[in-house]
Amino acid sequence: MVHEQIETRGVRDPRVLEAMRTVPRHLFVGAEWISQAHADCPLAIGHGQTISQPYIVAAMAEALELTGSERVLEVGSGCGYMAAVLSTLALQVYGVELEPELHERAVRILARVGCSNVSLACGDGAQGWPEHAPFDAIVLSCAATGIPAEPWLQLAMGGRIILPMGAPQETQELILVRKTPRGSRITRMMPVSFVPLRKDRDLPC
């Protein structure tokens, strides 16, 4: 999977490639999708959400340029797959998921695979996780029409936030934004399609 789907498409960071080899994606998908667990496509995980395709996960992780000393926040942690990948690349990972059932599933799976440096919360990811800020990097695993204000405030100076930018049911653009003393520096990466960011008014936890 890693060579054909990820490395040949330009992902070169050896730590990211090793993470994609070692994190068992099949444990994060439903039983009905086991046969496609290593296919390079998103798969439904219930509640209108998906586990992202491996190439996109790898590309997002590589773009953050993690060295192993960072504190990373994931907004929309879903079943926990991205958090598991990030856990091999960062010092500490924090994930916030709005849907209670997915949150509970992620807690179980991450415990099973031994991700001891991941902390998960059930709540509104659009509010970030202020108790653990500042973060060196933030991942939005859901599409937004702009950078959510609270996570941006919780991002350390020089930190990076990566997110799919665009409206639901439209092709979005994956962008990387670096926080600078003068504001921000944006890198546009590729077209993507993600489920939209949901807030607590859509589904209380």
Q: Each PLM stretch: what is its role?
A:
Residues 65-185:
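Conserved nucleotide-cofactor-binding alpha/beta core module
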Residues 184-205:
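Class I S-adenosyl-L-methionine
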